[in-house]
Amino acid sequence: MFAQRKALENSEKSLSEFIPYSAVIAPGVVICREGDLVATVKISGKVFEAVSNDALQRDAERQNNFLKVMASASSTDEMSLKVHRIRRVVHDELSVPDENLSSRFVRDFVRAYNSEISENNLMATELYVSLVSHKATALKRDKYKESEIREELKERLEVFGKVFDQLVSSLRDYEPAVLGEYSDEQGIIFSHQLSFYNYLLTGQWQKVRVPFMPLNEALGNVQVFGGADTLEFQTALGKSYVQSIELKDYPMATYSRLLDGLLYNTNFDQSSYPFIETQTFTALSKNKGLKALKLQQNQLRSAQDDAVSQMQLLSLARDMVANGQIVIGDYSYSLLVFGSEDTVVAHANDSVKKLQDAGFLPIKSTLALVTSYLHQLPGRKDRSRVAKISSMNFAHLASFHNFPCGKRDRNPWGEAVALMKMPSDQPYYFNFHYTDPEKDSLGDVPLGNTAILGASGAGKTVLLNFLLCSAQKYRDKDHQLSVILFDKDKGAELAIKAMGGGYLAIENGKPSGINPFQLEPTTENIQFLIGWTKRLIGRDGLQITPLDEQRIATAVETVMSMPAKYRRLAVLPQSLQTGDRVEDAQNSLTMRLSKWIETGPLAWAFDNEINTLDLNEFPNFGIDGTDFLENEDVRGPITEILLYLIETQVMKDKRRTIIVMDEFWKYLSDPATAQFAFDKLKTIRKQNGIFVFASQSPEDVLKSERGSAFVDNTATKIYLPNPYANEKDYTEGFKCTKDEFSIIKSLDTQSRLMLIKQGPVSVMIRLDLGNFKRALKIFSGTAGTTKFGEKLFSLVGDDPEVWIPYFFGDKPLPTSEKEEA
């Protein structure tokens, strides 16, 4: 590919001859050797995936307004705007849970997941906007005095500064950060601006000092060799190869999403790749713009071209220029695609296809290869394939679109829960809490409640178990973490037990192990039991009189004064009066309680000899409600006890707590439970807790009396695919935009994609655990694997260090058990 390399080496010109920069002349301003002024601002960009076209067009119109301002300032110096969109490879790996406070399964999975995420190309998209003031004319011959030169430069800097300030102001919604100078601990002055320009030359980020020599001699620590259509970069860190793509022709119309396809990896046979996209717009005066449009019209007429629609568009453009709605400018585009010697061609071909799909006519640079490379530098005037376009066209093409990245550190509980990938291969740092990305929120107690909605088969169970597994790192030497999960269909039993947790499946007719009267006889517990017993007896709909309430209170206090081993629900009637009349006896508290005790049909629920439910026994505790959720008699009383135990056993010391309710709307069917959950939803943050509720349908949530309150008190909403989604439920109930709803409804349930929304910002995420077959077998919690796991638990116990090797076949099982697997 580089047959001419020897000749190139022999006749090699110093790269410094092509670098336009001379010196840092003012904070954040570089002057070029020909007198041009350059300043650059980095912006975070703006989300666009679930944003309406109307909103994106309004953004483009604001950008168009600045370009008109820039054109009006070009009466003395010609102004250019150069926009860079950089895609580069990044690596990151989050921490693994504490070895002494988590199970081996958790640590092995999190470590392997973090490693895969880091090793497979993660991409960062960075946006830079540079303003260039091209010196219109050389100094007059009689202006040789240094004072006169300084005065002219001062005037130019003043005008340039005002326009640049307007640029930064126009970018305020994009979180602008002006690139300037900074000092290290030794007082050495470095420059972010020079680091950026040097990156454009070398393809590598490095700190650059403000030198005491001309900038063109200090920058560009790279050797560049050119082939027919490829450049080779050699730096101290290695080699890279680059191909450049230009545009020969453009679509008839532009719109804001036109070039966004370059950000997505649509070819799963190859990894995402780095590139530097450069777009330059040099504003023309109104007269020059009108002349340029008239020239294009004349050329069409001379060619006897039948492009009537093009003529009409040009006429419309002339009217808009004349009315001051747009300006015309010289536009150029280059896309430098990076790769290894083996991959650069495939990467460039992929970009060519994406540009073709967007309606462009792209071409790889050959004769203009070096020009395209140098065109990246703000301040370089030479460029190939210059086209006349409008300021609105440029606003559409250089649209400043980007993706939110979440918040990696300084969250209320520290590091992000998990690093997840977007379809663009960019990292997203997921958190339950929603806090200002720029603020240190460590130790704060903001809202962290999270809703997860998705149709059956969309991956809700896997996502829940993945997040809980990842969250185990929040249990460390300085902090306790308790996870309480109200399960459905035992979907999380394997995951909870693999995390070293406990699991209680409450099944109709089988002793639940719950005996609330064996709680400690504190005043708080006794008062709860009085109220709970009153509600339990009153579930038959008959009136509880003030005298009944007094009798219940006395009976509960009497039972709670006994030794723990004697305390149970069946003892309560001994302290309840039945009345003298037959009618009184038939409707007595004792009779109404009879179905809940001894041989009564519901005695299995609470009349247990020993209480085996202790939420502090395990750091992770799962409770399966599949059976009792369908049983209206016991659903409310059981849930009320469970929530009370969470309040008193787990959350009282304000430890970090995550409460999860799968198909939680069923728990809300009982009014008392709904009230408790509603109160907890509003106050849980003050106790350092998070409520996570999941459901297959928003309709189930919203039909609850307090459904809208649950929506309003969630910081994070995760929407998995739902092809049966109802627009009213999502847009009115959960306050999704129509564009967000459209995405949720259109996603394939097998895509492993989801939409995560925090505040006004939503982002598409893909959670693909296809390379983690073992973890998926546990996270998915299918009926077959759960049944097999339960057989293992009965044989070898619940210790994950023991049962997991059998579960995965690392240890041989008896033949009968092996067949079950």
Predicted regions and their residues:
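Hydrophobic anchor at the beta1->P-loop junction of P-loop NTPases
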Residues: I452
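Conserved AAA+ ATPase "SRH/arginine-finger" region at the nucleotide-binding site
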Residues: I506-N508, T716-A725
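P-loop NTPase motor domains
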Residues: K46, Q57-S72, T266, F360, ...
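Walker A/P-loop NTP-binding active-site region of P-loop NTPases
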Residues: A458-N515
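P-loop (Walker A) phosphate-binding loop of NTP-binding proteins
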Residues: A455
